[in-house]
Amino acid sequence: MSTTTAGILFALSLAVALAAVHVPLGDYMYRVYASEKHWRAERVAYRLIGADPAAEQGWGSYARSVLAFSAVSILFLFGLQLLQGRLPLHLNDPATEMTPALAWNTAVSFVTNTNWQAYSGESTQGHLVQMAGLSVQNFVSAAVGMAVAMAFVRGLARRDTGELGNFWVDLIRGSLRILLPLSIIGAIILVSGGVIQNFALHDTVVSTLSGAQQTIPGGPVASQEAIKELGTNGGGFFNANSAHPFENPTTWTNWVEIFLLSCIAFSLPRTFGRMVGSRKQGAAILAVMAVIATLSLSLMMLFQSQAHGTVPTAVGSATEGVEQRFGVADSAVFADLTTLTSTGAVDSFHDSYTSLGGLMTLFNMQLGEVAPGGVGSGLYSMLVLAVITVFVAGLMVGRTPEYLGKKITPREIKLAATYFLVTPLIVLIGTAVAMALPGQRDGMLNTGPHGLSEVLYAFTSAGNNNGSAFAGLSVNTEWYNTALGLAMVFGRFLPIILVLALAGSFARQGRTPESVGTLPTHRPQFVGMVTGVTLILVALTFLPVLALGPLAEGLH
């Protein structure tokens, strides 16, 4: 069997598994968020934080709760990192102490579900910070995204009310009923596949074949690895992330990790369909995600299997930066889905990809990570795209656009349009400023188009809350830690505020009855329209800078 055939079968097996869990997992998440019963542990949590689970929140109150919780989380994680040298289970190397700028960047990164890492995990963060700080944020940052998605869906489903649910209920339920049990199952599977789980510090020293001494780091990796993927977080316990054999030792664990980072995001459209009372609507959103993901994955595997140069031509593919235990095709699947979602974990070196392969990782993020996107964020981003598509279709036929019985008035389209302007502005302004400052250009290890691609990738990853990197850029500087931290904050919370405002606007409306002029939003034509609008929006926005970066490199 050729490696290409094996890679196609690898991808198909993932598609079959995701299709198999789509209905049961989507229905389960619907029951979680629609249930009126509270677990005992949940009631204890409500009392501890002083939340009334029976109280509903309008969009403003919901947004303030999201921002307040996230701000407290950033402060806690920031302080925990700076104090870790005085806490148990810390690393003994004084050189690993965090600077305030790096601690800020890391705290923001994990709270925003980005998991951008400007440090080497195994030599910087102690086990207590990994468990009580980073792993906890892997759970709750994902739960925040899911909560916002549920609030937006309620805005579409409800009528004549300004209430979107209760953030604290959504947050705790998402963490305890969905993410925690699934991550336990995932961790057990990963441990059985060879991922390590221990409390060993840097006290294991072995002799290498050359006679030198080498320190082998350990830690509670499997438990963090499971939620890292499941919550589309992506921050690695080790610097090499999922390319490290302690995090991802075999092809089987590689398959499991790709499945984990995709399963919730691909199942949420089913939850959406159940909540709005039309499973066909959920199926249409899923179809858009599947079409875009299939196109992207096909191109990624094609570009990585056809590389120029003596060695790649002899080997038959681009093997630089690829772990041989996975191979080019399986690594391409991982790279594609980690950038289509907001995960950002890597099992290969994206900076070593072909110019067009690297272009695909950039393009996937610039799509807004909607196919399927991050847990929660992918769904609400796709639904905003659906709103824009309905508006464009309404302009074409001269009718007032409606989506799920809700009219799209000037207020709604302004919010939706602003939503899709935020991230491109963050990415393009950040890249332009970095390229304009001579001191920041010194951090580029490559010149020319690839150097531009590295800077563009950094701000694209931060602004879209992905976290992966073209690692040929020195970003552990005060300027980059601060600038990328701001990009992550604005890229996460400005869209959330706009989405919640849009949800509140929809929730206050009544339901408009369908008429002969209503655009059907559950048919293949609508799937094609949303797909086209998504691709056109990205092409118009980012094509000029992509032409200067990866496209120019590919032509050269």
Curated annotation (Swiss-Prot):
Pfam families: KdpA (PF03814)
Disulfide bonds: none
Chief place of localization: membrane
Stretches that traverse the bilayer: 6-26, 65-85, 133-153, 176-196, 249-269, 283-303, 378-398, 419-439, 483-503, 526-546
Keyword Membrane (UniProt): yes
Record-level GO cellular component terms: plasma membrane
UniProt keywords, alphabetically: Cell membrane, Ion transport, Membrane, Potassium, Potassium transport, Transmembrane, Transmembrane helix, Transport
Stored HAMAP family: KdpA
Quaternary structure note: The system is composed of three essential subunits: KdpA, KdpB and KdpC.
PANTHER family for this protein: POTASSIUM-TRANSPORTING ATPASE A CHAIN, POTASSIUM-TRANSPORTING ATPASE POTASSIUM-BINDING SUBUNIT
Family to which the UniProt record says this protein belongs: Belongs to the KdpA family.
Name recorded for this polypeptide: Potassium-transporting ATPase potassium-binding subunit
